[in-house]
């Protein structure tokens, strides 16, 4: 027997005062900064975004919304980020915003205290970052991560390929899921450690976005273990 839900019986979903204000501000900003002609012009650019607009976004404090004030952020929640992302999508304003916000959350949940103090203030003020978690099998199960990290002494050497990595050319670092000793870990990979031939642009449906395959073979942390986040947060 089918069960029907009366919409009138469903609880109303409202916006907080902060969310309502952010919608208005974000709508105005995105509308002004991303007219159709600007969107079309950026389709021909390698990066696909305007760095001056990115700097303005950082100055507005949007990158620090989901970061606690302890680490240089504003200390609100992801619910306050949603209105901004919604307006960016509506007006096709392409930036590394989502990639950087998600990378910040990965550090916040999986990093050591030293890593949080080092990285999060930078992300809150305009340093871009990204995530590398997709692999060719398309499986989201962390137990099936095929990218590996081999430990020799205090040195971690990576292998494997990540796909659909957003905004890697603009990112200062990528946080990737890697299996180390059969345990899923988050590994921080500075993008300046990636040779140009390790990054290949992929074709995707949305031409306003940039996504890449990133080959990790031979990438090493040079003994600087700070690049390795606390892996137990990803253990299944």
Locate the predicted segments by residue.
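Generic N-terminal amphipathic, Lys/Arg-enriched alpha-helix
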Residues: 2-13, 33-39
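Glycine-rich beta->alpha junctions and the first turn(s) of the following alpha-helix
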Residues: 10-24, 89, 197-236
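Buried hydrophobic positions in well-ordered alpha/beta secondary-structure cores of metabolic enzymes
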Residues: 19, 30, 61, 68, ...
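Short secondary-structure junction/hinge motifs that connect adjacent elements
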Residues: 37-59
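A short, Trp-centered hydrophobic/proline-enriched beta-strand micro-motif
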Residues: 125-135
């Amino acid at each position: 027997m089918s069960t029907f839900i009366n919409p009138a019986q469903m609880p109303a979903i409202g916006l907080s005062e902060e969310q309502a204000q952010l919608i208005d501000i974000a709508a105005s900003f995105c509308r002004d900064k991303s007219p159709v002609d600007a969107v079309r012009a950026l389709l021909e650019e390698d990066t696909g975004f305007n760095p001056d607009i990115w700097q303005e976004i950082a100055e507005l404090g949007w990158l620090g919304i989901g970061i606690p004030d302890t680490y240089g952020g504003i200390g609100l929640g992801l619910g306050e980020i949603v209105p901004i992302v919604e307006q960016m999508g509506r007006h096709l304003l392409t930036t590394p915003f989502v990639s950087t916000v998600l990378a910040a959350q990965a550090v916040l949940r999986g990093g050591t205290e030293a890593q949080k103090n080092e990285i999060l203030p930078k992300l809150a003020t305009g340093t871009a970052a990204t995530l590398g978690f997709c692999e060719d099998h398309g499986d989201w199960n962390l137990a099936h991560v095929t990218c590996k990290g081999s430990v020799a002494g205090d040195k971690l050497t990576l292998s494997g390929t990540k796909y659909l990595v957003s905004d890697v050319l603009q990112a200062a670092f990528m946080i990737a899921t890697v299996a180390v000793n059969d345990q899923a870990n988050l590994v921080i990979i500075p993008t300046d450690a990636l040779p140009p031939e390790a990054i290949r642009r992929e074709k995707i449906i949305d031409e306003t976005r940039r996504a890449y395959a990133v080959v990790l073979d031979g990438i090493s942390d040079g003994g600087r273990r700070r690049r390795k986040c606390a892996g137990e947060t990803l253990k299944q």
